[in-house]
């Protein structure tokens, strides 16, 4: 059976892995053929079968394998009887003791049992279907496929399971698990199947190949796909738009200097430009020759492709961001004039070789400062391949191999590659939800372990050496999205980590442990203050500074807003909440700067509000998520329904978008289309219901008219499962407008948090006691008698 291991290295024999904090937060999967009873194996198989049978209706996994493991290890048994509010009948009495609190206590008890030994909550953080295939391709090219994923191994079985389970009915694969089929992911997953031993006549391969050929073949794959297929030898580098490594030796005053790029864009094109500059191609194996035959139509086989023309081709299914004409003009100029010069003597000797070395220096720097995890999974594989191209037997490549397990995750739908783990992000919200429950006496050890994890996960130092020369910002005092070893500061992760430490510092140390030293809190404040932009908003990773017109040069076809760093509503709100709390507890530290920061940040939030009263959420789906965050920031700064027209408009949006059954349900299509789109059939989603509910609570809805809150609470209470869990529903995370991300822990964190805030706010108003609510009414009006 598969087992999740937490807080461990790869064993004493692996000298190529190291940690800054004894691997706190590290989560890796290992297969033990001797583990598990027949009953446990049967439970796993039942979970797999259930997912398979329902895969057309529910795409995200329920992340059951590690949950089964943890619940068994902790001998968990739900001892609090389940309560439900009757759906039938005219009225149903609800009291604080019998309904909301019972559901809350059951959920807290269940969720506490899922905490790992090091204090964090493990969870899947995946969903995009272009994460895993490049890893398999890289290992195939470097000759390490059988080392990492041996033939006939359980790893291969689970990878194949994942690919098969998420193939769409039309034979293709989407950009993410809920998306329509795209050329990019269909071609990559087809190649992955073939590398892993699936024959071309296998039903999954045959239907995928038909999908590809019916749309003209892989000449229409987007630019990232063209790059990977060129590396493999199934495409030609002359069919790619130029990615000159000379970019990395440009003068820093130029507007398109890489130091001004968004860090993820910079980190993707850094190794890509190295591989392009080398024109690296893997060995042309018999399989590669077969793929050349399989992926091109008979009318235009591989050897007859017009590669120059192919550079600008992109399947309509992939074209979310069509290139503007100015971008194509730049690519054509580089392709026709610049590249022919830079690849000939003496320019190839004195310019290109220098550019390649500088690029590789940056790759090594980033690898070292992330302990070879790198900033994310797309970048990880490219940097690993670049290290192998430079030195196939070098330590850098071996250190990359040692960190591959950090990215792999196993659930009932198979093995997938994570973005890079959401350990700190999930734990920060989990702790806040548990603290809001007011069940401190019941969960003291849970809070203490969580507190220790958060303290252990704070980044203690800035990047090494002259980090500004390497285009890096300060990181000391920050929190990452995953764990300390990752090393990359994130503003909202830092703000949420700071909030946790401040909240826990107000509690008895004998329950939650020693509070964090003030100096470390000051470091966190310093990071947040350093990131605010001129218009008051906060970016996620690095200061905003580049010209917005640079987005015209976005080289991807399926993402938007990826060239430069931008401000985000969620990051800004988190920072407001954290700094407001900090200023109350430490009024003597940089108070004027913090007050000025909050004033500008509130101005940014008010300006960012949409006409309908909502805010666009960049990291969750979508307007519901953004509105919850924005209202939290506004409330922390003293903005109320009474004194703020911004808050009143937001409340109007939330009440108008509440569904018939009291919840909220928003389609992921809201994100790419940038307009509110309800779930099909006006269904509700429990995570989004929690967001909408907490948004109204921030805006004082409990004091004005609690009926909408009662209706939402009824949905959450009645949806809770027998063991205290909540059901998995639609995907709720997003990045770069167009790609969805599955946060498996959200289904526990947010319903718990919403119920906790509901109980706390409404208990204060004594609304829950002795109140008879018309639960079956869909009206937002209620009378007290």
UniProtKB/Swiss-Prot annotation:
Record CDD domains: SQCY_1 (cd02892)
Location of the active site: 492 (proton donor)
Catalysed conversion reaction: (S)-2,3-epoxysqualene = beta-amyrin
An example Gene Ontology CC term for this record: lipid droplet
Pfam families, sorted: SQHop_cyclase_C, SQHop_cyclase_N
Keyword vocabulary terms for this entry: Isomerase, Repeat
Family statement drawn from the similarity comment of this UniProt entry: Belongs to the terpene cyclase/mutase family.
PANTHER family for this protein: BETA-AMYRIN SYNTHASE-RELATED (PTHR11764:SF58), TERPENE CYCLASE/MUTASE FAMILY MEMBER (PTHR11764)
Protein name: Beta-amyrin synthase OSC2
Taxonomic placement: Eukaryota, Viridiplantae, Streptophyta, Embryophyta, Tracheophyta
């Amino acid at each position: 059976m598969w087992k999740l291991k937490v807080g461990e290295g790869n064993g004493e024999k692996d000298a190529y892995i190291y940690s800054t904090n004894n691997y706190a937060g590290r989560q890796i999967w290992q297969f033990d053929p001797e583990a598990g009873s027949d009953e446990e194996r049967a439970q796993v198989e039942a979970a797999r079968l259930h997912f398979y049978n329902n895969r057309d209706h529910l795409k995200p996994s329920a992340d059951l394998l590690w949950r089964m493991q943890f619940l068994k290890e902790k001998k968990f048994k739900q001892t609090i009887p389940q309560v439900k509010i009757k759906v039938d009948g005219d009225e149903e009495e609800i009291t604080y003791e019998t309904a909301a609190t019972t559901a809350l206590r059951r959920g807290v008890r269940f969720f506490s049992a899922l905490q790992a030994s090091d204090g964090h909550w493990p969870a899947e953080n995946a969903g995009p279907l272009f994460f895993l295939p490049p890893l398999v391709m890289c290992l195939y090219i470097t000759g390490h496929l059988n080392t990492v994923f041996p033939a006939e191994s359980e790893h291969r079985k689970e990878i194949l399971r994942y690919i098969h389970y998420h193939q769409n009915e039309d034979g293709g694969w989407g950009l993410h698990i809920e998306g329509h089929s795209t050329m990019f992911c269909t071609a990559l997953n087809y190649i992955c199947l073939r590398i892993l031993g699936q024959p071309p006549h296998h039903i999954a391969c045959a239907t995928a190949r038909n999908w590809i050929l019916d749309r003209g073949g892989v000449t229409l794959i987007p630019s990232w796909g063209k790059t990977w297929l060129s590396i493999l030898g199934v495409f030609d580098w002359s069919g790619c738009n130029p990615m000159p490594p000379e970019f990395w030796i440009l003068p820093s005053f130029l507007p398109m200097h890489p130091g001004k790029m968004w860090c993820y864009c910079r980190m993707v094109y850094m190794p890509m430009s190295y591989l392009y500059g080398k024109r690296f191609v893997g060995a042309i194996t018999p399989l590669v020759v077969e793929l050349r035959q399989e992926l091109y139509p008979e009318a235009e086989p591989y050897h007859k492709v017009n590669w120059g023309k192919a550079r600008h081709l992109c399947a309509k299914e992939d074209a979310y961001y069509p290139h503007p004409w100015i971008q194509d003009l730049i690519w054509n100029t580089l392709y026709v004039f610049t590249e022919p010069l830079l690849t000939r003597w003496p320019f190839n000797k004195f310019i290109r070789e220098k550019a390649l070395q500088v690029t590789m220096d940056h790759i090594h720097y980033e690898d070292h400062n992330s302990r070879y995890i790198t900033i994310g999974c797309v970048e990880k594989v490219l940097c690993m391949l670049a290290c192998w191209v430079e030195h196939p037997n070098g330590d850098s490549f071996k250190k990359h191999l040692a960190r591959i397990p950090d990215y792999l995750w196993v659930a009932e739908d198979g093995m997938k590659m994570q973005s890079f783990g959401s350990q700190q992000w999930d734990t920060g919200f989990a702790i806040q939800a548990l603290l809001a429950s007011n069940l401190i006496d019941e969960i003291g050890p849970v809070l203490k372990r969580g507190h220790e994890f958060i303290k252990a996960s704070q980044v203690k130092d800035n990047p090494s050496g002259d980090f500004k020369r390497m285009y890096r910002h300060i990181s000391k005092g920050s929190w990452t999205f995953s764990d300390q070893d990752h090393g990359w500061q994130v503003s909202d992760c830092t703000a949420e980590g700071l909030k946790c430490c401040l909240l826990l510092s107000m509690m008895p140390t004998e329950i939650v442990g020693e509070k964090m030293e003030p100096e470390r809190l000051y470091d966190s404040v310093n990071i947040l203050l350093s990131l605010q932009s001129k218009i008051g908003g906060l970016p996620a990773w690095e200061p905003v500074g580049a010209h917005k017109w640079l987005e015209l040069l976005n080289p991807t076809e399926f993402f938007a807003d990826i060239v430069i760093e931008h401000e985000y509503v969620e990051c800004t709100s988190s920072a407001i909440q954290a700094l407001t709390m900090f200023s109350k507890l430490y009024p003597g530290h940089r108070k004027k700067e913090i007050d000025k920061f909050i004033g500008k940040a509130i101005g940014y939030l008010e300006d960012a509000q949409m006409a309908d009263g909502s805010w666009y959420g960049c990291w969750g789906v979508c307007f519901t998520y953004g509105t919850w965050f924005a209202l939290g920031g506004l409330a922390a700064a003293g903005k109320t329904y009474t004194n703020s027209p911004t808050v009143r408009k937001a409340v109007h949006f939330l009440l108008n978008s509440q569904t018939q059954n009291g919840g909220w349900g928003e389609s992921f299509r809201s994100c790419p289309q940038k307009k509110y789109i309800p779930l099909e059939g006006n269904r509700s989603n429990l995570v989004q219901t929690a967001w909408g509910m907490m948004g109204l609570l921030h805006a004082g809805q409990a004091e004005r008219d609690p009926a909408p809150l009662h209706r939402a609470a009824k949905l959450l209470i009645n949806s809770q499962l027998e063991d205290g869990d909540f059901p998995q529903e639609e995907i709720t995370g997003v990045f770069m407008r167009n790609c969805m991300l599955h946060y498996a822990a959200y289904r526990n964190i947010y319903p718990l948090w919403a119920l906790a805030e509901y109980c706390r706010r409404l208990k204060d108003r004594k609304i829950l006691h002795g109140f008879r609510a018309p639960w079956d009414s869909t009206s937002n009006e209620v009378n007290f008698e």
